[in-house]
Structure formats: structure tokens, C-alpha cells
Amino acid sequence: MTYCYVCPHRCGVDRAETMNSPNGIFGSCGCGMQPIVARAALHMWEEPCISGTKGSGTVFFSGCNLHCAFCQNYEISCLNKGQEISVERLKEIYFDLIKQGAHNINLVTATHFTEAIIASLQEPLPVPVIYNTSGFETVDTIHRLKNKIQIWLPDLKYSDDLAAIKYSNAPNYFNTATTAIKTMYKQVGPYQIDENGLLKSGVIIRHLLLPNMLENTLRVMDWIADNFEPGQVLFSLMHQYIPCGRAAEYPEINRVVTAEEYQKVEQYLFNSGIEDGFVQEDTAASADFIPIFDGTGV
């Protein structure tokens, strides 16, 4: 690939040249072609069907095509903290995690390194591979990952496109993400859970409740209820928002979600027709659950 069109921004930047020239033009992700990883370790704080009893083999990539103002992983997603590695090293990391007992390999924010991901998964792994994404994906990229990804873990951050532009620089986010999610579902079908309660394949749609944005969340749940039947996808309502990154620049989101806000959303969910999924407790809204990006496992 000479010019990059891997994500919906379609920057058209020569990312190989970007990293070789001090005056190179950076795309939205701010990265070259070689993967940059900030942490690779067993992670116990994903959904129970992902973390299981031994942990999810989570690989945190640096850089991102969204740069959400409130990102909890801001130092790696926006400041690109991490270590550049080869595709061969990336493959080694997968097997290092599997040897540690990982139930799966969990690729966090890997979209801009799709070429490296495809190269690293030429041979199938003995555990499921999870693609942990913002949801801001192209149909073409999803198609290219067919048979390499068993579990799609997209966010559906916004039903409100103005909010998507304001906080994440993601124009047309809702249509883009919902089209991507439908494509993911067509690729892997209804979710499958094994005898140990671990997810073997399928789609989990995540949504993070933001302060002062109840309608945004309700419309997300409406879309899921309208487009999927029980038994098809899992929904994960996340209650872990704390102001991070540049959230202080936006007073309306520079606070935690109130108990009243969460209760309204939770009640709406229980009446929505969505039957399969997870709800986080309010104790999840803590900086204690943010990983330390110190190069562990890289």
C-alpha cells in the first residue's frame, strides 16, 4: 500500500514516507506503517466471556484514527507513546500471551496497522482473535480481515453525528459505524459461547455512557434493538467514564456520569428488547482500571 485509505478518513497519505522524512505529512492516525505497541499483557477487566478466568491477551496499539477528547488511553492513542516493532515480533507477542494462558488475542485500536495485522495472522492462531475497535471502519478493511478475526468488538460511540465531530473528529460516524457493524455480523454470524462461558466468535457492541448525553445513548440502543434479534449480538453498556485526555476543554463532559443518568439508561435498556449482554457497575468508573502503558510485554 502506497497511499493509505484503510479507515474512513481516507487520508491518502504515504505513511511509509511519513516516517522516513522529517517533513512527512501525517494522516489522522499520526503513524507510519510499522506497528507501535504500548503494552501486551493478560487483561482481566474485559467482559466476562472475553477475560474468563485467565485473562484476555491484550495488545494495545499506539495511535488512533479518532483521537477522542476524553480517551482513557490518551497517552497512547493521541500522544503515540509506545515502541515500534516488526511483524515478526508481533507474532511472537501473540504466542507469548498464549503461553501465559490467554483465552484469546485482543487487538486494541489496530485499524491503522491493518497491513501488519493481516501479515501477522497469515497462519491461524489456536485461540480466537478479537478486533477491538472504535467502530469507525470501512467495509473494505473488514472484508480484508475475513477469516483472520473471529470476534468483533466495536464501539458504537455516537448516534449524534455533531457530538462525533466535536469530540472525536469523526464525520458521519453513526452511518459509518452501523454499516461496519452490520458487515462484521454478516462475516461471523450469531455469537457462540463455549462450555466454559468464553466467546468463540461473534460481535459484542460496546457503548460508553457519556455525561449530559442520554439521548445519544438511547438512540444507540434503539438502533441495536431494531437491527438485531436476541441471540445475534451481545451489547455491553459501559459505565467507566471518567474525564481523561482533553475532557477539561469541554465542561459538559468534564465530570463522571451521575447515578440518576445511569439509572435512566439502565431502565431504558431493560425495556428495550435487548436481551443479551453486559452492564457495568458504577465502580468501573475509576482510574484504577486504566492500564499502565510502560511497554510491558513488548
Question: Residue spans of the language-model regions?
Answer:
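Auxiliary Fe-S-binding modules of radical SAM enzymes
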Residues: 1-23, 190-298
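N-terminal [4Fe-4S]-dependent radical SAM core
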Residues: 1-65, 69, 73-78, 292-296
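Glycine-rich active-site/cofactor-binding loop and its immediate structural neighborhood
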Residues: 62, 67-100, 106
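Glycine/Thr-rich phosphate-binding loops of Rossmann-like dinucleotide-binding domains
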Residues: 81, 162, 287
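Flexible, glycine- and charge-enriched loops at secondary-structure boundaries
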Residues: 83, 87, 170, 174, ...
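Positions that flank functional sites
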Residues: 86, 112-113, 284-285
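Conserved AdoMet/S-adenosylmethionine-binding subsite of the radical SAM
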Residues: 92-251
